[in-house]
Amino acid sequence: MRTEYCGQLRLSHVGQQVTLCGWVNRRRDLGSLIFIDMRDREGIVQVFFDPDRADALKLASELRNEFCIQVTGTVRARDEKNINRDMATGEIEVLASSLTIINRADVLPLDSNHVNTEEARLKYRYLDLRRPEMAQRLKTRAKITSLVRRFMDDHGFLDIETPMLTKATPEGARDYLVPSRVHKGKFYALPQSPQLFKQLLMMSGFDRYYQIVKCFRDEDLRADRQPEFTQIDVETSFMTAPQVREVMEALVRHLWLEVKGVDLGDFPVMTFAEAERRYGSDKPDLRNPMELTDVADLLKSVEFAVFAGPANDPKGRVAALRVPGGASLTRKQIDEYGNFVKIYGAKGLAYIKVNERAKGLEGINSPVAKFLSAEIIEAILDRTAAQDGDMIFFGADNKKIVADGMGALLLKVGKDLGLTDESKWAPLWVIDFPMFEDDGEGGLTAMHHPFTSPKDMTAAELKAAPENAVANAYDMVINGYEVGGGSVRIHNGDMQQTVFGILGINEEEQREKFGFLLDALKYGTPPHAGLAFGLDRLTMLLTGTDNIRDVIAFPKTTAAACLMTEAPSFANPTALAELSIQVVKKAENN
């Protein structure tokens, strides 16, 4: 039906007869001439109808936005004065000789001249996806997956599929369950990741595996989360953690070079402890020049409990954040930042405004200065490298509250004051995570997943001091987003059972849930390691959007609903009966 795409016509096509198929993006009726902007997935081209082709001109008068049409015509160069430098096709236009209206369009529920609500965009997603910016995002996503496949193939990886209907395993979120009609009362689980299957593939001898795969997690959503998402899943045998990172870093550098024309360079490596200390986060945004500075040792003897308490508590922390030029902040802005850190459990936000250092105490403005000696204030200013015009904020509490609150404040202030360089790309690896974290109930939970190997520890050493264990794990972070994470896996049965025991999984439960894995570990399991990238998040970064729904063709809302199809929906009673399922309604509160 077509010979060319609208958006691909150039001066090289001048004089050629072409047939185009697409949609009316806009129509301009000048009486004797009618111009339309005709659009397809590749872009927009101007088509015009003149009186010499009376039939086509007459039919063109009926055109409205989003009519689906076919046009045959001749490509012509535009006059110099009519060239549109803002359009890729702006140097040419098509003189139509024939027009076919393939399908007419009703009055549109989306308005191209206004910003539509996200609810409307999701309900009429098939119309929203016609917009050039949305089409470009999905084209970029397709390019990314193509580049990934070629790269992985070139590096000896095998694309192997793993099951969608599998067994529920604890991976940190709730599973989506699928009832079995054949096995009454039993359920499959949709995979949160192919984690165990890819490890089993390593045990099967397929030493380089990858898959671009759907995963499912029934969890509360955020702007960068979806109940179903896509991973670039990778696993290797006989490779160390640095070797895995080297290959995966090369993949990501390849993507940025091909999609953005940007060489990311070598990725710096930072330990979890350093990231938390300097940035209050295991996902630091290195585009932001600010860092946290520990000052607890300077404040242990002050007569100000807000500082002295955490400074003398082994579980406490006092951190300072120097904001260049921050002395210009108003009291209202400072109060807003104080309320902001309270979201993370902080009690407030102390500060020192540095107006003129040379004047000593008279050159600063601070509600806490009266509790501090001139020597201590000078020491704080020296340690933070404060200059005239700067602001110093303080966080004082337990380590987690300080890290969470001050880390979030660092990001917010950096964005608010334009200190974060939005034009840069700042990738890094974060390594050496704690293997376990407190579950809040006196036990431990795996910081990554229970199949991650500890670093330089035997099973006996791990059992004796699990709180000291460092995971042989690594995350890739770009501009403050975790885009991928992985680890060296446990390849020894005793170590795996030790980890299960630390996590409170008794031997009976181990056999019930992971018997197949424990059995497989008995038969010459190779050392193996892997990683998974979030394709949706990678695409989000590469297309410059801050909403992951913009890079998924048919996403869910934050309530995990599809507004277009109205999923989820009630099941047919007959289907439920066949599955031996009865829906129990919750009693309403009186």
Curated annotation (Swiss-Prot):
Which GO cellular component terms, listed alphabetically, does the Swiss-Prot or TrEMBL entry include? cytoplasm
- EC number(s) in its UniProt entry? 6.1.1.12
> Which reactions is this enzyme annotated as catalysing?
tRNA(Asp) + L-aspartate + ATP = L-aspartyl-tRNA(Asp) + AMP + diphosphate
Question: Which residues take part in binding L-aspartate?
Answer: E171, R217, H448, R489
Q: Name a biological process GO annotation.
A: aspartyl-tRNA aminoacylation
In terms of PROSITE patterns, this protein maps to: AA_TRNA_LIGASE_II
Give the first-level EC class, as a single word.
ligase
**What does the UniProt record say this protein does?**
Catalyzes the attachment of L-aspartate to tRNA(Asp) in a two-step reaction: L-aspartate is first activated by ATP to form Asp-AMP and then transferred to the acceptor end of tRNA(Asp).
Q: Identify the HAMAP family for this entry.
A: Asp_tRNA_synth_type1
Protein name, per record: Aspartate--tRNA ligase
